[in-house]
Amino acid sequence: MNQLIDEGHKLNAVFGVHINDTESYPEAKGFNEELVDPTKRGWDWLDPSYFIKQRPDALSGRRYERFKELKQKAPNLDYIYVDVWGNQGESGWASRQLSKEINSLGWFTTNEFPNALEYDSVWNHWSAEKDYGGTTTKGFNSTIVRFIRNHQKDTWIISDNPLLGGAEFEAYEGWVGKTNFNTYRQKTFAINVPTKFLQHYQITNWETTTAADGQIYGTIKLANGAEKVTVTQADANSPRSITLNETEVLKGDAYLLPWNVNGQDKLYHWNPKGGTSTWSLDKKMQGKTNLHLYELTDQGRIDKGAIATTNNQVTIQAEANTPYVIAEPDSIEPMTFGTGTPFKDPGFNEANTLKNNWKVFRGDGEVKKDANGDYVFSSEKERTEIKQDINLPKPGKYSLYLNTETHDRKATVTVKIGGKKYTRTVNNSVAQNYIQADINHTSRKNPQYMQNMRIDFEIPDNAKKGSVTLAVDKGNSVTKFDDLRIVERQTDIMNPDKQTVIKQDFEDTQAVGLYPFVKGSAGGVEDPRIHLSERNEPYTQYGWNGNLVSDVLEGNWSLKAHKQGAGLMLQTIPQNIKFEPNKKYTVQFDYQTDGENVFTAGTINGELKNNNDFKPVGELTSTAADGQTKHYEAEIIGDASGNTTFGIFTTGADKDFIMDNFTVTVESKK
């Protein structure tokens, strides 16, 4: 995390941590009955939460000690996002004290609800995301407060002041299911850049009227030292105009806005209609003879060439709804994808990445945007093979994870360390991606089967070279790869002996996801209700406060499903566990559940199209009476198709299911 922060700061990014000081969860290291009231439950998704005794927590100094611990672990963090706080109500002294603690450690404060932490918070989620949350909690509408603090905060009702605008939040990487980068780009440059330009200045004069629909029109003047800004709009049928020192920098929806970051001057241009427009340069850009126009894309800047200046004016030919920046070439730094990882551009996001970062041996592979707007490496039909040499981390045990999708077409991933090869193949992706916050999540219109594939390998002391190869056989369907990631491995769970396919105790804290499982179709595309639960006795265990299950069965970690909706809850996939055709396997695991006739183990051959495709194997009965762990064991035979998977089905009752020590063994040959 610290590396991410330090590298991100070079790109002018800021980083925060999401906290909750209203509720606490039993897994939290600071959780105890002194912190929370066990009789008052809060949000209940991955686990039940309990309301914190906020005043005692503040007065005791324990909360501040937790903040100081965070500061020690992430010294360059920029801000704290306070979730829930105030529960859509005011909280007086408690809010001021919370912010005092946050600010004293060099962080600024942001939060969820506009009507809490008003004095100190500079950004509210429910204000910034117009379509999220309640319609009556959308920010401050006070003209007096905005007059005083417009340059300090993004906490306003952003749709009632066309003069000043408002910073609007738009997701494109999976939050609330959104993946449209074009919408994000549109709101950034059409709405947010003009808003932020005005926030570089303080309001000095406010002469407006309020229309019948609540919209504010007229003239607002702003200043920052000698720099003077005026924004005007007469009514809803008139264009907005912004001038800087009497030079028009925005007219209607088009603009050429001056910007200065770290001493470097540039000009942002946006014209929703496109075409040719002429603009006067502000004083800082006048006299510069080496200005270039750059198109801004999600793969970096595209140099459109030098732009001529005549009488301190520039004429720009722009595409509609396309952002540009005018700057001197020596102020443009190249973008590097994959900093701090063994890979160059592990997500295929760089322009010309195949040419620059990979060796292409054969095939029709290319990087393209998929239906969700994500750049992926895609092979259409031909036999395809690409390879990248990697920067080896220190000697040790590692796992390569990458997103993979293929259909009736063999895909092979090979890690080569020195002279040793580690290979994994998959012929068919049978499980759609139901993780809402994953940009690769599925939809009815655009089914997505991208799921993690894992290859375990070791780096010996004398290793000097390493590579990763992605290969696809010839076929009639599209195969995709994306998001390569190498993590250090703490356990050996795959093929520890000749008969054992996997022995997963979930104790590897470096591991990614729920391996070898993925979220099934239960609940549809949503934030999952399944996670790896960490032991924190007695609070996570059977008996405390009426707990009917232990969240951790053995060791420090177990897999927990909490109140999951009806359907296929968990399943393996062929790229993680391959049940070979006609071979006999024994599947076993330990479990607890408070549900009787709620959870069922079984198999699926291919994709689950309807519930009848799930074939129950064995029983999972309640352990709630005594809290004693039970053991499941069953034999299954791999289908001739090679597409057999194992999973857990639920009827959807508000019950929990805990799994540990998941093991698959294959019958030995006699």
Describe the predicted segments one by one.
Residues 348, 384-413, 453-459, 468, ...:
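Extra-cytoplasmic beta-strand recognition segments
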Residues 379-393, 422, 433-436, 539-543, ...:
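Secreted extracellular polysaccharide-interacting domains
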